[in-house]
A protein has these predicted regions:
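C-terminal catalytic subdomain
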Residues: 150-152, 167-243
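FAD-binding core of FAD-dependent oxidoreductases
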Residues: 33, 40-60, 75, 79-80
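Flexible loop/turn segments at secondary-structure boundaries
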Residues: 50-52, 88, 199-200, 212
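A glycine- and small-aliphatic-rich helix-loop capping segment at beta-alpha/alpha-beta transitions
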Residues: 2, 56-67
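An acidic, phosphate/nucleotide-engaging active-site surface
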Residues: 1-44
Length: 244
């Protein structure tokens, strides 16, 4: 009989009758299979964020389930892309570099792009004429974001060691990434479970680092400016009230 528990605290989960949902985080190979069958767009259930990039790599380059190092590199590429403009400075410690030429550096921040090669190495960039920054610092911070142990980042298809990664600045807003090491995947999946126990809603945005209060104000101004640009583009009026 299964006795599932919360992965961090070890606390037992409620009785099955109280569970509202349970979703296993799947990997990249089902996405690659869908592409192999001719899909132009793949609609999937819960999967790890990096799987959408790794699945495309597996399909394009023909990587196998035991190409551990390549799978780790593809996972890293997906991890670098998965949070969008965090990689281009959206939550960078040295945030003042992003607004060196004005707040438009954040308001018009560009999303990251990865040009991948068959050996697993890739170059991170962003569209021209967009704000933000692609540097060793921005890419390195995203590499370490939410991975736990950098020598054992576990996803369904591979266990990744990012301590061997090499990151080199190739030019303005172009960073070359290579050298991730992979090991065989575990025999378990992470599962997200929800259960009914009342309701609570809220949004918390954490900003940290040097001059965090000033950083927070700049980001608030940028969020409102970006939202107002969207409203104007849709021929809608301004906010009647804002409270931050």
């Amino acid at each position: 009989k299964l006795a599932p528990s919360e992965m961090y605290s070890g606390i037992a989960l409620p009785e099955i009758s109280k569970l509202a949902s349970a979703n296993a985080y799947l990997g990249a190979f089902p996405i690659a299979e869908a592409l192999a069958q001719g899909a132009d767009i793949v609609i999937t259930g819960r999967c790890v964020d990096s799987a959408v990039t790794l699945g495309a790599c597996i399909h394009e380059f023909g990587w196998s389930a035991d190409d551990w190092d390549k799978l780790a590199c593809g996972t890293l590429a997906g991890h670098i892309l998965e949070c969008g403009p965090q990689t281009t400075g959206g939550n960078f410690t040295d945030w003042e570099q992003i607004i060196a030429d004005g707040i438009d550096g954040i308001v018009d921040i560009g999303y990251p792009i990865a040009d991948l090669s068959a050996d697993g190495s890739f170059v991170v960039g962003k569209p021209k004429a967009t704000g933000g920054l692609v540097s060793i610092g921005t890419v390195s911070e995203q590499m370490l974001y939410e991975i736990g142990d950098p020598q054992a980042y576990i996803v369904p298809d591979v266990v990744c060691d990012f301590s061997t990664v090499k990151i080199v600045q190739e030019g303005p807003d172009r960073v070359h990434v290579s050298g991730a090491t992979g090991y065989p995947a575990t025999d378990t999946y992470k599962v997200s479970v929800t259960y009914a126990d009342g309701f609570r809603g809220g949004v918390l945005r954490t900003l940290y680092g040097i001059d965090a209060d000033k950083k927070a104000q700049v980001y608030v101004d940028a969020v409102l400016a970006r939202a107002r640009n969207t409203l104007r583009g849709s021929n809608l009026g301004d906010f009647s009230e804002t409270s931050i």
